[in-house]
């Protein structure tokens, strides 16, 4: 027997920027016992992220920006170094990530490669992130990047070896960025 889920109640606690649900559901275990759970679930939509890399120069493009949740959780500056990313809204993942790449990094990417889709915090957040990589060159730089009007993004072109070292030193602590940098290392695309 497989587990069965029955929704008992879905109460919206907040629908400001994203939606916070208070969900009550019954979970029927494999042995037939029914367990009632009450959980808060944060629905922020799905997203996409991309790591830009240059195999000839042995560099990657990352961004640095303020992330309020990290600041609330003790990151004194609130600054986070991460891969370019954004919410899908109503776009397809590849369309979204191309748009975000030019807005945030200033690079107009060519061929992109989708790697995988992952839930990053499935215990309470609905977001499914689509992960991409793309090679970039200096000739693809269309503008300075930096995000849209309500963003303050610094574009960082770093040696790949330095970015990997920044994981070890704790300078890079963003999960999606660590995953993509490690993928790039394991794939030997930078060898």
UniProtKB/Swiss-Prot annotation:
Q: Where does motif Nudix box map?
A: 86-106
Q: Which reaction(s) are listed as its catalytic activity?
A: GDP-alpha-D-mannose + H2O = alpha-D-mannose 1-phosphate + GMP + 2 H(+)
Alphabetic keyword roster: Hydrolase, Magnesium, Metal-binding
Question: Where does the chain bind GDP-alpha-D-mannose?
Answer: 17, 38-40, 67, 85-87, 104, 127, 150-151, 176
Cofactors named for this entry: Mg(2+)
CDD domains assigned: NUDIX_GDPMK
The positions annotated for binding Mg(2+) 1 are 85, 104
Cellular component GO terms, alphabetical: cytosol
Q: Which domain of life is it from?
A: Bacteria
Using the record's annotation, list all stretches that form the Nudix hydrolase domain.
43-180
State where Mg(2+) 2 binds.
100, 104, 151
Does this UniProt record's set of keywords contain Magnesium?
yes
One GO-annotated biological process of the protein: nucleoside phosphate metabolic process
- What GO molecular functions are on record for this protein? hydrolase activity, acting on acid anhydrides, in phosphorus-containing anhydrides; metal ion binding
User: Which top EC class is given?
Assistant: hydrolase
Pfam families per the record?
NUDIX
Report the EC code(s) recorded for this entry.
3.6.1.-
How is the subunit organization of this protein annotated in UniProt?
Answer: Homodimer.
Q: What does this protein do?
A: Nucleoside diphosphate sugar hydrolase that hydrolyzes GDP-mannose as its preferred substrate, yielding GMP and mannose-1-phosphate.
User: What does the comment on domains in this protein's record state?
Assistant: In the dimer, the N-terminal domains are swapped between the two monomers, such that residues of both chains contribute to the active site.
Q: Which family does it belong to?
A: Belongs to the Nudix hydrolase family. NudK subfamily.
In Swiss-Prot or TrEMBL terms, this protein is called GDP-mannose pyrophosphatase
Which species expresses this protein natively? Escherichia coli O1:K1 / APEC
* UniProt lineage: Bacteria, Pseudomonadati, Pseudomonadota, Gammaproteobacteria, Enterobacterales
């Amino acid at each position: 027997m497989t587990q069965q889920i029955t929704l008992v109640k879905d109460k919206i606690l907040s629908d400001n920027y994203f939606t916070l649900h208070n969900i009550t559901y019954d979970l029927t275990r494999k042995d037939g016992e029914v367990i009632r759970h009450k959980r808060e679930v944060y629905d922020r939509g799905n997203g996409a992220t991309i790591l830009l890399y240059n195999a000839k120069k042995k560099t990657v493009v990352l961004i640095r920006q303020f992330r309020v949740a990290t600041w609330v959780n003790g990151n004194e500056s609130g600054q986070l170094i991460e891969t370019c990313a954004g919410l899908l809204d109503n776009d397809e993942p590849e369309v979204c990530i191309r748009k975000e790449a030019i807005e945030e990094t200033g690079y107009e990417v060519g061929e992109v490669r989708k790697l995988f889709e992952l839930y990053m915090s499935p215990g309470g957040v609905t977001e499914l992130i689509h992960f991409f990589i793309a090679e970039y060159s200096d000739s693809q730089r269309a503008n300075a990047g930096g995000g849209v009007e309500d963003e303050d993004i610094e574009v960082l072109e770093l040696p790949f070896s330095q970015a990997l070292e920044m994981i070890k030193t704790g300078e890079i602590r963003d999960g999606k960025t660590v995953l993509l940098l490690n993928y790039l290392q394991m794939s030997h695309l930078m060898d």
